[in-house]
Curated annotation (Swiss-Prot):
UniProt function note: Part of the RFC clamp loader complex which loads the PCNA sliding clamp onto DNA.
KW Nucleotide-binding (keyword) present: yes
Subunit and interaction comment: Heteromultimer composed of small subunits (RfcS) and large subunits (RfcL).
Entry similarity comment: Belongs to the activator 1 small subunits family. RfcL subfamily.
Name of the protein described by the UniProt record: Replication factor C large subunit
Superkingdom to which the source organism belongs: Archaea
GO molecular function: ATP binding; ATP hydrolysis activity; DNA clamp loader activity
Gene that produces this protein: rfcL
Keyword field: ATP-binding, DNA replication, Nucleotide-binding
A single BP term in Gene Ontology: DNA replication
InterPro entries referenced in this protein's UniProt entry, alphabetically: AAA+_ATPase (IPR003593), ATPase_AAA_core (IPR003959), P-loop_NTPase (IPR027417), Rep_factor-C_lsu (IPR023935), RFC_lid (IPR047854)
Binding site for ATP: 63-70
Length: 422
C-alpha cells in the first residue's frame, strides 16, 4: 500500500516548514530558554528573549487545520533529539487514562540515544470539560508539575472553557498558508512524483483548500491516483473541488468581509453552515463589527426580517422563501451603505446565550427527568406537568420533605438537585 503523501512529504526539520517563522522562533526560544537543546539549533532559531516566553509553563499552538501545528512539534523533537510522547486529547480524555499513559511514558527509559522527552497533547480543544471526567484539569496538573516540555495544539483555543489552560500557557498562532505557498509545495510534489501538473490545476486545488496544506496534498494524491501522471484543470472540474468545513468564526468573517452580495450569500452553500447557529452568533457579533449605530441598526433590521421569514418557513413549510431569508441574513447584513473598511482581524466573542444554555444544561436535564417521571406516573401530558403539577409539588414539598426524598429515590437524583428544580 502506498504511503500517504502527507506522511511521505511531511517536513523533517524547521527549515522545511513553510512560512511559519514567527511560530518557529517562539517555540525554539522557549525550548532553549527553559530546557536543554543543541547549541547550533538555539543559535539559528532562538531569536526571542521575551519575558512571556521565558515564563510560559507550556506552549499552545493555535491555528486552522493543515497549517503544520503537529508537524512543527515533530520537527522540533527531531531537531533537538527528544523522544516525543504524543497523545490525541480527543482519544485520551479522562484523568485516569492521561495519568496512565503519561506516567508510563515518563517512567520508561528512552531508546536510540534520545536527549530527553517531551509531551504533545494534540487537538486539546477536542476535550469536553463536563463529559471527560477531569481530563482538562489533569492536563493543567501535568503542566504545573512537569519538568519536561509540554506542547499542545488546538484549532480554536479561545473557547471560554479553555481559559485556565491559556492562563498558564503561551498561545502561539500559526498563519493560514497563502495560495501561492500551497501551490509551491504541490509543484515540488508533482516534480518528485514525476507528474506533469498544469499550473491552473494546482491553483484550483490550492484555492479550494483554503490554506489547509494537508487537505491540498491529500487532494493532489487523490487526483493522481491509479498511476496517473498528468493533471489538468479539466480533471479537477470533472471530479469536483473540495468544499471546506468552516468554523463559525470563519463563517462570520467571510460574511462581514465579503466584497459583494453574492460572495456573502455563497457562505450558505458551505456544508458546515447552520442557520440557527449563524443567527445566534450574528446577533451578538453585529455591534462588535459595526461601531456606527446607524449601520448596526440596519444590520439588525435585516437580520430580524430574515428571522421572520425563517419563522414562517418553520410554521408553513414554505421552503421557497428560504432564498429571501438567506439573502437578508447574509448579503443584507454584509452589504450596507456606508459600511467602513473592516480591520484584518476581528475578535468575535462566543455568544453569551450559548454559554448560559451550557451552564443550565444539567439543571434542565434534571427538570426534564422529573417531568418525564411525573408524566408517566400521573398519566398527564408534559405541558400540564410543567405548567401545573410542578408548582403544586413545590408548594407541598415546603412542608413535607418526604415528597422530595421519594422523588429522589425514584429518579436516582440527589435530593438537593430535586429541590433546586422545584
Amino acid at each position: 500500500m502506498a504511503l500517504p503523501w502527507i506522511e511521505k512529504y511531511r517536513p523533517k526539520s524547521f527549515a522545511e516548514i513553510v512560512n511559519q517563522e514567527e511560530a518557529k522562533y517562539t517555540l525554539a526560544s522557549w525550548i532553549c530558554l527553559k530546557f536543554r537543546a543543541p547549541k547550533e539549533f538555539c543559535t539559528r532559531w532562538a531569536k526571542k528573549r521575551d519575558k512571556e516566553v521565558a515564563e510560559a509553563k507550556a506552549i499552545l499552538l493555535a491555528g486552522p487545520p493543515g497549517v503544520g501545528k503537529t508537524t512543527l512539534v515533530h520537527a522540533l523533537a527531531r531537531e533537538i533529539r527528544y523522544e516525543l510522547i504524543e497523545l490525541n486529547a480527543s482519544d485520551v480524555r479522562t484523568a485516569d487514562r492521561l495519568r496512565q499513559v503519561i506516567g508510563r511514558g515518563l517512567r520508561e527509559s528512552s531508546l536510540f540515544g534520545f536527549e530527553g522527552k517531551m509531551v504533545l497533547f494534540d487537538e486539546v480543544d477536542g476535550l469536553h470539560v463536563k463529559e471527560d471526567k477531569g481530563g482538562l484539569e489533569e492536563i493543567i496538573e501535568i503542566i504545573e508539575t512537569a519538568k519536561i516540555p509540554i506542547i499542545m495544539t488546538a484549532n480554536n483555543p479561545y473557547d471560554p472553557k479553555f481559559r485556565p489552560l491559556r492562563d498558564i500557557s503561551l498561545v502561539v498562532n500559526l498563519k493560514r498558508l497563502s495560495e501561492e505557498e500551497v501551490v509551491e509545495v504541490l509543484r515540488r510534489i508533482c516534480t518528485s512524483e514525476g507528474a506533469k501538473c498544469e499550473e491552473e490545476a494546482l491553483r484550483s486545488i490550492a484555492k479550494s483548500s483554503m490554506g489547509d496544506l494537508r487537505a491540498a496534498i491529500n487532494d493532489l494524491q487523490m487526483y493522481l491516483s491509479g498511476g496517473r501522471r498528468i493533471l489538468t484543470l479539466d480533471d479537477i472540474k470533472r471530479v469536483g473541488e473540495r468544499n471546506p468545513q468552516l468554523s463559525m468564526f470563519e463563517i462570520l468573517d467571510r460574511v462581514y468581509k465579503a466584497r459583494w452580495f453574492d460572495e456573502a450569500r455563497a457562505v450558505s452553500f458551505n456544508p458546515s453552515f447552520d442557520w440557527e447557529q449563524y443567527f445566534i452568533w450574528a446577533l451578538e457579533s453585529i455591534p462588535v463589527v459595526y461601531k456606527d449605530l446607524e449601520i448596526a441598526s440596519t444590520a439588525y433590521d435585516r437580520l430580524s426580517k430574515a428571522d421572520v421569514f425563517m419563522g414562517r418557513i418553520k410554521r408553513t413549510q414554505e421552503w421557497e422563501l428560504l432564498p429571501y431569508a438567506l439573502e437578508l441574513a447574509l448579503g443584507g447584513v454584509s452589504q450596507i451603505k456606508g459600511k467602513p473598511r473592516l480591520p484584518p482581524f476581528i475578535k468575535y466573542g462566543f455568544p453569551q446565550r450559548l454559554l448560559l444554555l451550557a451552564k443550565s444544561k444539567e439543571a434542565r436535564r434534571r427538570r426534564d427527568a422529573l417531568v418525564e417521571y411525573l408524566a408517566q406516573n400521573l398519566h398527564a401530558s408534559k405541558s400540564v406537568i410543567k405548567s401545573e403539577i410542578i408548582y403544586v409539588l413545590s408548594a407541598l414539598s415546603k412542608n413535607n420533605q418526604s415528597i422530595i426524598e421519594k422523588l429522589s429515590k425514584a429518579l436516582g437524583i440527589n435530593a438537593i438537585d430535586i429541590k433546586s428544580v422545584l
